[in-house]
């Protein structure tokens, strides 16, 4: 069978809509995906058996060396919501505040918050059949509830819209139509429970990624500068290229951080990253970013202009390397080398101070 026939046969076997409701893009490589998934399915089956044994009984999930190892190897879809809720602390928060989520929805809202959320509903996952108005049930109402409740729960953040801006504009950090709405949307797809999605969003925005979504976005800006320093330490040739062209890192990686790789990397890869993010915290984002850059260092160094650099950073988030999520996750724990929270905390302190001095 020649490649064209193999591709056509794979297209006939692989559903056009993935298990999460996303339509596969026109240029989707069905043959490569089918080949990858045939081996990944074996891994998923083995992991499912191990997780079922671990979760047997009513003891719950507690952070441990064993759980950390299991999480890094992937949480089966059927257990993902339960494990995320446990390791992130969201379950404990929800248990401590029975009825709180529903009281938020029953309270008074502000017209500006309501308008901001409604503006983004139709443009949240337009390629996902579950978020379309024609879907039954349509997840837009669930998404609205989660975002409204969170905006009322955390008024310092409210609802962070990431509006479309031209690269390099004064609001360049708020690039693309992606942000808190897309993160909440992913949570809803996995938990299928709006209250759990609310508490997981609270874990991310309130604790795991503090100040990422505040009006000043100081935490987000700080971590982008931290990545720049880590690249300077671990990949000096790439840092020199950026410095030589005067490229701001926010131009290249702001969406990686603020979207947590949603709409950037393949869905299953994002979920594997989030498995570790909920369990190990924000250093996982740095591991993913450094791995993407290091793996494609030679390709990036071929760039000869700012537009060329930007294009290469878009290209490194596509292809087999990021689609083959199991191998990719193994890479993020080996490629960047040692990366302690002590180092990240130290860099955050100095980078934050520098940003505050500038402003």
From Swiss-Prot:
Query: From what superkingdom does this record's organism come?
Result: Eukaryota
Give UniProt keywords alphabetically: GTPase activation
> Which Pfam families does the entry link to?
RabGAP-TBC
Give tissue specificity per the record: Highly expressed in testes, expression greatly increased at postnatal day 20 and remained high up to day 90. Moderately expressed in kidney and liver, weakly expressed in intestine, lung, ovaries and stomach. Expression of Growth hormone increased the expression in testis but decreased expression in liver and kidney.
Question: Which molecular function term from Gene Ontology is one that the record holds?
Answer: GTPase activator activity
**Where's the Rab-GAP TBC domain?**
74-281
Q: What is the lineage of its organism?
A: Eukaryota, Metazoa, Chordata, Craniata, Vertebrata
Name the job this protein performs. Answer: May act as a GTPase-activating protein for Rab family protein(s).
What is the protein name given in its UniProt record?
Growth hormone-regulated TBC protein 1
């Amino acid at each position: 069978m020649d490649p064209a026939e193999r591709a056509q046969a794979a297209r006939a076997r692989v559903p056009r809509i993935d298990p999460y409701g996303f339509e596969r893009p026109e240029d989707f490589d069905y043959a490569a995906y089918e080949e990858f998934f045939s081996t990944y399915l074996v891994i998923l089956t083995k992991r499912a058996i191990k997780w079922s044994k671990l979760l047997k009984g009513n003891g719950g999930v507690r952070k441990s060396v064993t759980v950390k190892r299991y999480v890094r190897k992937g949480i089966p879809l059927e257990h993902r919501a339960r494990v995320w809720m446990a390791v992130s602390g969201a379950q404990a928060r929800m248990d401590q505040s029975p009825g709180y989520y529903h009281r938020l929805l029953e309270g008074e809202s502000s017209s500006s918050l309501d308008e901001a959320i409604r503006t983004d509903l139709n443009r949240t996952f337009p390629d996902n059949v579950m978020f379309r108005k024609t879907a039954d049930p349509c997840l837009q109402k669930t998404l609205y509830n989660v975002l409204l409740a969170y905006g009322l729960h955390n008024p310092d953040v409210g609802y962070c819209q990431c509006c479309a801006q031209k690269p390099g504009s004064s609001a360049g950090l708020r690039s693309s139509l992606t942000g808190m709405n897309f993160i909440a949307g992913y949570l809803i797809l996995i938990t299928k429970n709006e209250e759990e999605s609310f508490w997981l969003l609270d874990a991310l925005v309130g604790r795991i990624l503090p100040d990422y979504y505040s009006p000043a976005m100081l935490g987000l800006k700080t971590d982008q500068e931290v990545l720049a320093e880590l690249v300077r330490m671990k990949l000096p040739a790439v840092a020199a290229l950026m410095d030589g062209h005067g490229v701001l890192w926010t131009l290249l990686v702001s969406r990686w951080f603020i979207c947590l790789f949603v709409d950037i990397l393949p869905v299953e890869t994002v979920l594997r990253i989030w498995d570790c993010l909920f369990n190990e915290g924000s250093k996982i984002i740095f591991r993913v970013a450094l791995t993407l850059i290091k793996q494609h260092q030679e390709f990036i160094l071929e760039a000869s202009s700012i537009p060329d650099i930007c294009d290469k950073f878009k290209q490194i988030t596509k292809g087999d390397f990021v689609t083959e999520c199991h191998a990719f996750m193994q890479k993020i724990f080996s490629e960047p080398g040692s990366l302690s929270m002590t180092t990240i905390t130290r860099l955050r302190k100095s980078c934050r101070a520098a940003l505050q001095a500038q402003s």
